[in-house]
Swiss-Prot record:
UniProt pathway annotation: Phospholipid metabolism; phosphatidylethanolamine biosynthesis; phosphatidylethanolamine from CDP-diacylglycerol: step 2/2
Catalyzed reactions per annotation: a 1,2-diacyl-sn-glycero-3-phospho-L-serine + H(+) = a 1,2-diacyl-sn-glycero-3-phosphoethanolamine + CO2
PANTHER family: PHOSPHATIDYLSERINE DECARBOXYLASE, PHOSPHATIDYLSERINE DECARBOXYLASE PROENZYME, MITOCHONDRIAL
Lyase among keywords: yes
Family stated for the protein in its record: Belongs to the phosphatidylserine decarboxylase family. PSD-B subfamily. Prokaryotic type I sub-subfamily.
Domain of life: Bacteria
Xref: Pfam families: PS_Dcarbxylase (PF02666)
EC number in record: 4.1.1.65
NCBIfam families membership: PS_decarb
Underlying gene: psd
Active site: D92 (charge relay system), H149 (charge relay system), S254 (charge relay system), S254 (schiff-base intermediate with substrate)
Assembly notes: Heterodimer of a large membrane-associated beta subunit and a small pyruvoyl-containing alpha subunit.
Protein name, UniProt field: Phosphatidylserine decarboxylase proenzyme
GO cellular component: plasma membrane
Length: 289
């Protein structure tokens, strides 16, 4: 590891993650025209954001930076995969890792893995249906579309807010911060689908101001304690989301992890670490019995 990388990792442990993220969140919600217009223009130029696919192409039309960052796309910008039974990629970005969940652990990077149960808030009962299953980790870069969508149609069963650190999420931290995704703040969403239980985990990162879901709105930051929300079939209005429907969004960041049970899916050919992906593309197909 280079000296620059060592210094970066050292700073990750020393920086006040949540304070820094709150300050960035305050700036991202600032509506002062002179400030937000300059910030949005700089960001779009710095990260070469393609505004031609956005519903609102005019950078100055956004009321604040967060509105720009979580911008909606034009209808048809992400057509869903047409393969029968296709499991859709939940977000734009790149595959960080994907593969089998082995011995209750998920591969993070060479020499590193993390606990499935810890990812889900330390609940062995929640983890049980995914033991021996499969996972896919999608990293969203700053230039990407930052809404997360349903890989399959599903009915929400449970949501868990898991407090944690806010390490940056990138290749350097994945290779050098043990249990990275099981240490960062995250929101776990569990669904019942035609392929059995499915979990979509929204993982926060440094300067990620908040995570939202379409049914609960702002989920982070509440009090920094683990909190579980249960949604059962006896509820007056069960929460059901169709395949491809928006699930949630990040305000600055970061990573979405999708979990499936054993023998349910086979990942699409050609997918591997660092493969660029777009929301709606074929992530996996049903595994044949």
């Amino acid at each position: 590891m280079s000296f620059k990388d060592r210094l970066f990792i050292c700073c990750q442990y020393l920086l006040p993650h949540h304070l820094l993220s709150r300050l960035v969140g305050f700036a991202a919600d600032c509506r002062a025209t002179w400030f937000k217009d300059r910030l949005i223009a700089w960001f779009a130029r710095r990260y070469q954001v393609d505004m031609r696919e956005a519903q609102v192409e005019d950078l100055q039309a956004y009321e604040h930076f967060n509105a720009f960052f979580t911008r909606a796309l034009k209808d048809g910008a992400r057509p869903p995969a047409q393969e029968p039974g296709a499991v859709l990629c939940p977000a734009d970005g790149a595959i960080s890792q994907l593969g089998p969940i082995e011995h209750g652990r998920i591969f993070q990077a060479k020499g590193h893995s993390y606990s499935l149960a810890e990812l889900l808030g330390g609940d062995a009962e929640l983890a049980a249906p995914f033991m021996g299953g499969d996972f896919a980790t999608v990293y969203l870069s700053p230039r990407d579309y930052h809404r997360v969508h349903m890989p399959l149609a599903g009915t929400l069963r449970e949501m868990v807010y898991v407090p944690g650190r806010l390490f940056s999420v990138n290749r350097t931290t994945a290779e050098n911060v043990p249990e990275l995704f099981a240490r960062n703040e995250r929101v776990v969403c569990l669904f019942d689908t035609e392929r059995g239980p499915m979990a979509v985990v929204l993982v926060g990162a440094m300067i990620v101001a908040s995570i939202e879901t379409v049914w609960a709105g702002l989920v982070t930051p509440p009090k920094r304690e683990l909190k579980t929300f249960r949604y059962d079939e006896a509820a007056r209005a069960p929460i059901h989301l169709e395949k491809g429907a928006e699930l949630g969004r990040f305000k600055l960041g970061s990573t979405a992890i999708v979990l499936f049970g054993p023998q349910q899916v086979a990942f699409a050919q050609g997918l591997g670490a660092a493969t660029p992906v777009r929301m709606g593309e074929c992530l996996a197909l049903p595994k044949q019995a």
